[in-house]
Amino acid sequence: RTDRMGRDERNDLLARIRGQTVLMPNMRPIFEKYIGELNPNYQALIPVVNRKLESLEPNQKRLAKLKKADFALFASNWWPHADFDQLRIVTYLAIWLFLWDDVLDEPTGEYADNFEAAQLYRKETVQFLADTLGLSISKEISTVVTYSFSDHVKVLARQLKSSLEYVLALHPSENDYMKRGGFVAGLKTLGKQLESAVRWGLRLRPTKKSPPTASHPIIEGFRVIGEELKTAYTVEQRQNFFEDLKFYISTTEMEQRFHLDGKLPTLKEYWEVRMGTSAVAACLAMIEFTNKIKGPYQSTNHPLLKTLSDEANIIVVIANDMLSLKKEIVQGCLDSLIPLSVPVYGGVQQAIDQAHTDLLAAVDRFDAEAEKLLSGPNTTGLSDRELRIFVNGCRDCWVGNFNWSLCTGRYGLGVIDQKSGSFHLPL
């Protein structure tokens, strides 16, 4: 009965929205006061992205749709200062986040209507992320196995001592072997043992085999990202990134429950979920990577930086949910900001106007927080230069997301006249 009531509520709301034409307010002044640059590697990245998509999506119709979204443009807007190699990896991350989520929440998604299968998909993903990032999961807490430098020195010393004793026939048990094998054989053995000792001391000893191929190609697609970050990031940075990804994955569970139960979430419930499903935090955690910053940093989860990260997240979500409204209504998706605001504010236009007001307020809060961070004492652990890069990187992301949203074929706004800033949008 509850399920039927929820579906009736959804159908009524969809009928209330469809067929209307609304005025999307001019958001350009909010974003254009900041320079929205485009990464100069954009054109070179397009064929790389197309090859990546072709390797992940066998369905030609869906492949064409994905190419139309222009992920190269997305990444080039979000990370305008990244070198090509770094830009390629963050673009792969953007693709991975979009595709991983589509399996669960698109109407045609593989596990959209199968919660049990979706849970297995989530569980395997979390484990695969940890493995590829060089982290191990234990009792829901991620740790990494490391050895101190002194441990390596002790092991190296023991192996060198053993090797020298062996070749010089100082070890009683090995005298007979030396006599039988001769001095050359002893030298060969010494060489092998020295190689082993040095490899251990330099942490070049054989490592565990990389995680086996994931059961789903989308999950497997994260491997190249994780392997890159194992070199580029410290344990702390990888842990921070992993926490943001885990939050993203966990909130998709709540989102799917709403969908399957037929229940429309309240605005409060929506925001609790959307702060994770937006995946903005995980993208902001790559600012250090795109700027080649390596250190024991938390960035997006640091108590002093989380407010800034959260405001950037809110800005991206509001602007995204406004500009993707047409796409969502065409697909019959109501779990986004504007549709859920309609019953609260009395209509679609009123919901859009309120979102615009909230967007302006979020930008003001972001600017105030950025000013506070950059003008006050720096106790974030980042250097002053690194802190400024992170703050500016957060701004690049929400400015870039707006510019991409107006151009991407994913939202279907390209054919609409946007020159005046505001535009009419038929739903």
Descriptions of predicted regions:
Residues R1-L427:
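Alpha-helical, largely C-terminal catalytic domains
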